[in-house]
């Protein structure tokens, strides 16, 4: 039985999988052809040379990361949902996001999330500089949190670690704090608490009726 004709989308799907697993350096035309079980000339026919392939992957990544749909009954909860979705996207596509950044398209990549945040800021009664503050603050929190998460994941074992550094003296006589800091960090819990506090602060100036309850 003849193999179905290869499509451009299949080439891009396979290329994206290789980049996600091994990084951009692992993406070669020969390797991609071998992955797809086709000739190198077929890859060139569908996507051009390697630079054209990388450009196509970046364009697709920008489009995919634009699909953020806020959820929740209040602006506060919908803003928090945008933050969670953006963090998840950045966490799930580190190599592809890095490629977007290297090609100078970072701001374009963030535009859909920013527009979603603007709509929710307006829904909460914030406009102008206050709405812009919502956009910037949420974006910076998400990006900063993701960078810290990745840094901790890649960092060598710390000696001394937090458990050794925190004691009765360094914790200002707070044994419950010492016990809490001795436990492994839960990035999801830290992120949720950070977003909740940030959104509550940002919406303080919003009309009470538009603000809604705190994000959960």
Describe each region flagged by the PLM.
Residues 52, 81, 95, 112, ...:
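Amphipathic alpha-helical interaction segments
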Residues 115-152, 156:
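A contiguous pocket-lining binding segment that forms or flanks enzyme active sites
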Residues 19, 54-61, 104, 109, ...:
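Alpha-helical DNA-contacting segments of helix-turn-helix folds
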